[in-house]
Amino acid sequence: IVMEYCSGGDLTPYLGSGSSKIPLICQQILIGLHALHTRGKVHRDLKPENVLFKSNGIAALTDFGIAGDRNKRMTERNIFGKPNQIFGTYAYMPPEQVNRMRGEATVLPTTDIFSFGVLAFQLLTGSLPFGDLSGNDELALYQKRGKNGDWNRQKLTQLKHREQWQQLFAGCLNPDFKKRFQSVQEVLEHLPAISQVPMERGYCPPQTVNGFCIRIMQGEEYGKIYQLSELIKYGNRILTIGRER
């Protein structure tokens, strides 16, 4: 396996540093996740050690060892319909990733969105949102707080753009993945405005101005967009999605 060399180190030095670059770093991480999700992939192990900086200062996602593929059914379930094992790093895992019975929910963008919320909270405050987790003794309480959505709001009182960050964390750290922010675009809308634009951008799906389109969210064509109005215009009135049997 060959990967791009990232000479700038990982995200750890920025945790709780108060750096003015943190909103920009968050934006770059989200753009990376967006590129991943539009291709049907879910990272499932987002944490400081897995975000590296290139020589130009751009943040890059790394370590896809336990990434999930929405296009592969066996990523989501074993032959019994339940996940084989629990993978990930407990401090950053959403409740459904810890629950063996909810394995199908871990191959959704909402898994990474929860992990991003934990990571962004740690970047801003220097601490984890659900309390200390320096040893196994604190794990059960940490997970209980995560399951209840009991993240430490007091840590945000001194932050600039506090209300925006609160809304972002409320949407990212919701314990119910169905009520959580459903896409990276939603998270970006709540990210405090920054003046600097990243040098590199991930894939962004085209937008339609007139007419209708359909975006495939499951299967081998995940992320593909069909411009329905154009198809109808040229006489194609039957659109077959998926394999013909």
Summary of predicted features, one role per range:
Residues 1-10:
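Conserved short submotifs of the Hanks-type protein kinase catalytic core
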Residues 31-41:
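Protein kinase catalytic-loop region centered on the HRD/HxD motif
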Residues 160-173:
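Conserved C-terminal C-lobe helix
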